[in-house]
UniProtKB/Swiss-Prot annotation:
Transmembrane segments: none
Assembly description: Monomer.
UniProt entry tagged with the keyword NADP: no
Protein's name in the database: Cytochrome c6
Bridged cysteine pairs (disulfide): none
């Protein structure tokens, strides 16, 4: 995974709602490690699936972003969650 690319993809596409690992729309659904674990969103596959398909207020990015960029962003999110954002 390319974490530098993941950070760029995240900044351009995700940070509007998820800056600093937070969630501007649904404040309890953050990208913090404990919340990701509690919602079974602490794997690359889980994050990639949700980014591609969307859920509730989150739009689908499949078709807007290539799979490699989504995977890099997912790796970046997990990396940042391990560091506590």
């Amino acid at each position: 995974a390319d974490l530098d690319n993941g950070e760029k993809v995240f900044s351009a596409n995700c940070a509007a709602c998820h800056a600093g690992g937070n969630n501007a729309i649904m404040p309890d659904k953050t990208l913090k490690k404990d919340v990701l674990e509690a919602n079974s969103m602490n794997t690359i596959d889980a994050i990639t699936y949700q980014v591609q398909n969307g859920k509730n207020a989150m739009p689908a990015f499949g078709g807007r972003l290539v799979d490699e960029d989504i995977e890099d962003a997912a790796n970046y999110v997990l990396s940042q969650s391990e560091k506590g954002w």
